[in-house]
């Protein structure tokens, strides 16, 4: 039996430790991780919801003036960028090695970012969805699917690499307007905190990148969009219906002249597909309205050869170009980088694709 005074002393010491832990809960102390210094913090939102978890990685000898913010796509977290599912170095290490400070975020209501029950609704992806769209596309659900060769392993349930990838899938906020709006605000708050940066988005997060640039044009040095949510306006396989009334976003983005209330003044026209392996595009009628704030921000849209985005990725680049954005379209297949799917930054040649992005950033 612990003596009474010893028990009291133990409780007091524990209380002090708990208070110290509570006071440092929202931001960790920096710690040496060998080649870089790391920390984490929360930013944006309110006390109960819509803050984002952020990890900061700083090289021991930074050589680049602007950091890179990485925002993962649907069902993913910042861990996407750390290593590949089969254990190879990820893009975070690559850009750290090239002197960039790196910020990895978890979207609002995602992963380590808080979610207040009752706001929107949460969903998760089953194994068949992950196989069909990302890892094992040996089918004909889109014309380029059979070209997919770069996923490590079989891409099927039971394969160690697939199982590691699927274990990293998390629930996501399925109310897309809530997700886009909250992530735009939280990542804008991150820019307010850290200053000018490049914003790198993947998939679902693509529309956030456009809106973050629209909200903070003086702080976004460039936008790298890896197969961003698209194409403009209307969904394509595996989704259907009207999704982005503002062209490249769900929520309001600034045009000049104005797009009107709820984008009702955006007139569109259908442009025929460039060939049988691609879809038609919805662009603006001439003369187009210009994306007022995005015009000042250079953008890179990256499309993979075998992805389900492959039939329509060029439409997003064409829409941005028509609206006055300084955009470059990196069609990986046409550049000789073959066999990639939607999760290109995790695949066997992930660092070859990282070189494409690095080259573009260094030109800005």
Curated annotation (Swiss-Prot):
Q: Does the keyword Glycoprotein apply?
A: yes
Compartments it resides in: Secreted
Q: Which GO terms describe its biological process?
A: lipid catabolic process
The Gene Ontology CC terms held by the record are: extracellular region
EC no. given is 3.1.1.1
Q: Which UniProt keywords apply?
A: Glycoprotein, Hydrolase, Lipid degradation, Lipid metabolism, Secreted, Serine esterase, Signal
Which positions does UniProt annotate with glycan attachment? 49, 262
Q: What is this protein called?
A: Probable secreted lipase phiG
Instruction: Tell me the organism.
Output: Fungal sp. (strain ATCC 74256)
Q: What is the lineage of its organism?
A: Eukaryota, Fungi
């Amino acid at each position: 039996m612990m003596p009474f005074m010893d028990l009291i002393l133990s409780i007091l010491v524990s209380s002090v430790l708990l208070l110290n832990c509570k006071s440092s809960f929202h931001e960790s102390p920096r710690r040496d991780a060998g080649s870089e210094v790391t920390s984490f913090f929360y930013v944006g939102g309110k006390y109960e919801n819509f803050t984002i978890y952020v990890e900061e990685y700083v090289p021991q000898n930074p050589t680049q003036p602007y950091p890179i913010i990485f925002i993962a796509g649907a069902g993913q977290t910042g861990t996407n960028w750390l290593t590949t599912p089969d254990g190879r170095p990820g893009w975070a290490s690559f850009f750290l090695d090239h002197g960039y400070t790196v910020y990895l975020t978890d979207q609002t209501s995602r992963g380590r970012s808080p979610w207040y029950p009752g706001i929107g609704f949460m969903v998760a992806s089953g194994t068949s969805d992950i196989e069909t769209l990302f890892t094992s596309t040996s089918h004909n659900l889109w014309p380029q699917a059979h070209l997919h060769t770069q996923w490590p392993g079989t891409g099927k349930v039971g394969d160690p690499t697939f199982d590691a990838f699927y274990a990293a899938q998390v629930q996501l906020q399925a109310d897309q307007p809530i997700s886009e709006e909250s992530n735009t605000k939280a990542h804008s708050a991150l820019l307010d905190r850290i200053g000018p940066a490049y914003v790198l988005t993947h998939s679902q997060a693509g529309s956030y990148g456009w809106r973050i640039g629209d909200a903070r044009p003086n702080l976004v040095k460039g936008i790298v969009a890896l197969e961003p949510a698209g194409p403009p306006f209307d969904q394509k396989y595996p989704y259907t219906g009207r999704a982005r009334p503002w062209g490249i976003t769900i929520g309001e983005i600034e045009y000049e002249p104005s797009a009107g209330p709820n984008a009702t003044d955006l007139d569109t026209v259908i442009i025929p597909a460039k060939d049988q392996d691609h879809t038609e595009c919805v662009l603006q009628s001439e003369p187009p309205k210009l994306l007022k704030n995005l015009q000042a921000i250079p953008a890179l849209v990256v499309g993979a050869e075998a992805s389900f985005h492959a039939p329509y990725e060029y439409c997003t680049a064409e829409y941005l170009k028509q609206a006055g954005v300084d955009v470059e379209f990196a069609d990986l297949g046409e550049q000789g980088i073959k066999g990639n799917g939607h999760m290109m930054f995790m695949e066997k040649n992930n660092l070859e694709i990282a070189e494409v992005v690095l080259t573009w950033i260094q030109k800005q």
